[in-house]
Design a protein with these regions (language model features):
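Short non-domain terminal segments
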Residues: 18-20, 30, 207, 246, ...
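Non-catalytic, conformational "gating/processing" segments within enzyme and secreted inhibitor domains
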Residues: 92-258
Length: 275
């Protein structure tokens, strides 16, 4: 623990991670949270990180969307997707169970926290889904299944309306053009919670912020002093800001030498080292 008053002296990267308490029914699945974390770090490695633009990724969202696709795969395709997602069980039923546990855990976030998970699949009306595929999507992911005519311009509005509703209006337009047949899969995760230690509005003040370009910007910056989990790694500092109930936290990384160097450092870090 450290008494920390944090000022922006470099490029600040904000990462929201969920501290999940998943207890799968199958003993071989007990490392699933670690494998999901590894998927997130592996995904971060492969992104083209910009030093000048903000970006946001949700490994859990991508895991759900690819998990839905994996549910309908078979043979070498299913094996390759399973390795990517950290689904290494020879039992399809056990793998579906751990994905169900992940969704159920996220849907039970605790008091004072809003966390909604929504999955949907739009299928072109020229295609008939396999019955078992439809059943698994509904049972494992609670997927909304809808048969539509992809070439119909109204399909864009229907999908965008679903996205807007699932994200509480935060994302109102996902598609500009009709999706490519035969299927369009989507996941949305909506999170809202108060800080465990609230920031005081009157404490927000103009402070210097130094982006990777070397410029000196003045921005409105929240601030407070208190005891928070803190660590210093190779090439970065990190502080955890817990949300109410202490089950979720925002981890704020301050890189020593820019975002790309931070990503390189995180390649050598496991999430258990930070949490």
């Amino acid at each position: 623990m450290s008494n920390l008053s944090m000022r922006a002296i470099g490029l600040l990267v904000l990462t929201l991670m969920a501290c999940l308490d998943i207890c799968p029914a199958h003993a071989e699945m007990n490392d699933f949270p670690d494998r999901l974390d590894n998927f997130g770090f592996s995904l971060l490695e492969r992104l083209e990180v910009s030093e000048t633009k903000n970006f946001l990724i949700s490994p859990a969202s991508i895991e759900f969307a690819l998990g839905m696709a994996w549910t309908g795969a078979a043979g070498e395709t299913a094996q390759a997707m399973g390795r990517l997602l950290g689904i290494n069980s020879s039992s399809r039923e056990a793998a579906l169970s751990e994905l169900t546990d992940l969704r159920a855990t996220l849907e039970s976030p605790g008091s004072g926290i809003t966390l909604k998970v929504a999955n949907a699949a739009w299928i072109d009306d020229s295609v008939q889904l396999n019955k078992s595929f439809s059943t698994d999507l509904a049972a494992t992911f609670k997927t909304k299944l809808e048969s539509v005519r992809f070439r119909d311009s109204n399909t864009i509005s229907r999908i965008n309306d679903w996205v807007s509703d699932a994200t509480g209006g935060k994302i109102t337009r996902l598609l500009e053009n009709p999706p490519v047949p035969p299927m369009f899969l989507a996941n949305a995760i909506y999170f809202h919670a108060s800080w465990n230690t609230p920031f005081q509005k009157q404490s927000t003040q103009p402070q210097p912020f130094y982006p990777a370009s070397g410029a000196n910007l003045t921005v409105q910056m929240m601030q407070q002093k208190g005891l928070f989990p803190y660590a210093k790694g190779r090439g970065y500092q990190v502080v955890a800001l817990p949300y109410v109930d202490n089950r979720f936290a925002m981890y704020c990384f301050l890189p020593d030498h820019g975002v790309n160097a931070l990503v390189e450092a995180l390649k050598k870090t496991s999430w258990s080292d930070l949490s």
